[in-house]
Design a protein with these regions (language model features):
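A composition/biophysics-driven feature that prefers long, compositionally simple stretches
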Residues: 1-132
C-alpha cells in the first residue's frame, strides 16, 4: 500500500490544522503504507506514532520501539519519514539484570483472594464462637 501522507497533509491544510498525531494501527498504516509488529499483534494504539505537520517541507516523524526501528527504517526508505525509536525493556536492561534483579513481593501480598477469604471466614467463626 502506498502511503497517503501527502493527501492527509493536504486535508490538514484545508481544515486549518497545523498537524496530526496518528496512533491507531489502521490510521498509522494508512499514513505510512506499513505497520508495526505491535500494531499487528496487539491492535493497541500508541505503540507506534506518526507525528506529521501540514507543511510538505516538514518530514513526518515515526516514533516506534527500539527493536522495530531498523525494520521501520528499511520500510520507510525513500519515503522521507524520520524514524525516532524509544527504549523499551529490551534496550534498557540486559537479561541477567532482568532475571536476577527481580524483587518479589512479600508472602502476604502473594496470597490469593481465596486464601484471604478463608482467613476471614475463620476469624469470623472464632469471633462468633467467643460471642455466642
Amino acid at each position: 500500500m502506498k502511503p497517503k501522507e501527502g493527501r492527509i497533509k493536504e486535508l490538514l491544510r484545508e481544515r486549518g490544522l497545523d498537524g496530526a498525531i496518528v496512533s491507531s494501527p489502521e490510521n498509522f498504516h494508512y499514513v505510512t503504507g506499513f505497520g508495526g509488529h505491535q500494531h499487528t499483534v496487539s491492535r493497541q494504539p500508541g505503540f507506534t506514532l506518526a507525528v506529521m505537520r501540514s507543511d510538505d517541507k516538514a518530514p513526518t516523524h515515526i516514533t516506534t520501539m527500539d527493536f522495530e526501528a531498523a525494520t521501520f527504517r528499511i520500510k520507510s526508505a525513500g519515503l522521507g519519514f524520520v524514524v525516532d525509536p524509544y527504549d523499551t525493556w529490551v534496550g534498557l536492561k540486559t537479561w541477567p539484570e532482568i532475571s536476577q534483579g527481580a524483587v518479589l513481593p512479600d508472602k502476604t501480598r502473594m496470597e490469593s483472594s481465596a486464601d484471604k477469604l478463608e482467613q476471614f471466614v475463620k476469624a469470623c467463626d472464632l469471633a462468633d464462637k467467643r460471642i455466642g
